[in-house]
Amino acid sequence: RLVGSEMCIRDRHRTCYEVVSENGLFQCELTGNMMYGKSDAELPCTGDWVLFQPFDENKGIIVYMLPRERTLYRKKSGTVADKQAIASYVDKAFIVQSLDDNFNVRRVERFMVQVLEENIKPVLVLNKSDLDFDRQSVEEQINHISNQIPVFFTSIHQPQTILRLRESISEGETVVFVGSSGVGKSSLVNALCEKSVLLTSDISLSTGKGRHTSTRREMVLMNDSGVLIDTPGVREFGLVIDNPDSLAEVLEISDYAESCRFKDCKHINEPGCAVLEAVNSGVLDYKVYASYLKLRREAWHFSASEHEKRKKEKSFTKLVEEVKNRKANR
């Protein structure tokens, strides 16, 4: 007997899932077919909607996952073309950077292009604004980005900044927090919820770097509006982009790309490329252009590897069907 209503994945710990239902929380596992018949990226993640079959007061088996929408992915570490699902049914992604040595505008770009790829609204959250930092330098670095996405300066020690961030979350919206370790994602979630719902830790005094507090993705409900998903800090965030050409539309070179002679200009060595002209004349910072080339190369590499992977899977499926047909005709 399947439970008729849809249930949402709140948390995943290895092969165990915590499912939120109208009847409370259930600890669930996957059926064998789901666990071994799917790639890691296809397994349920936080935010996914599923149907499950209860077999105890608070335990059950997940038997079906509904089609996904607005799922944020990243490239799985140590692989060429495998991807990992971070969260599903996401409306906004808070890209959190701290205003200390962690701040890196190139890293912000990396998160931003992946978030936009999935039709999720990016929001830049510059946390720990109570620290002593060069505000003018930061604003100059994010000038182009801030023309495209909202930017918030926040600190848990400055309540008015938390209030402004909370007001940006509409009722019913799901927000995922992404960023490096130690930028204060869990502390921000606690501040937005006005209570301690997630564990937090201090910055290491010896290294000045954050410790991993969140070890898994976890969903929490705000008191009066949205749903927040905290994620572990990441040391690397590999791109999962099908069309590398789309990068030029969201990065800083987009202002110049519109003037290129050819609409399909890739801004590498094409004649009449306005981007290259801007770089050569010094109008466009070479660091910005180099970042575009790096992200494009990475996106192209994944896209090509993914295409080859699908091609092999299609050939294997065809081979299996041929074997089945031969057996059936004996």
What name fits each language-model region?
Residues 86-91, 95-147:
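Phosphate-binding glycine-rich loops and their immediate beta-loop-alpha structural context
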Residues 39-56, 67-86, 92, 121-122, ...:
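Helix-rich effector regions associated with P-loop NTPase G domains
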Residues 186:
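Walker A/P-loop
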Residues 15-19:
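Short aromatic-glycine-enriched beta-strand elements
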Residues 2-8:
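Short, small-residue-biased leader/transition segments that mark boundaries at the very start
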Residues 25-42:
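Beta-strand/loop nucleic-acid-binding surfaces
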Residues 131-183:
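Canonical P-loop GTPase G-domain recognition
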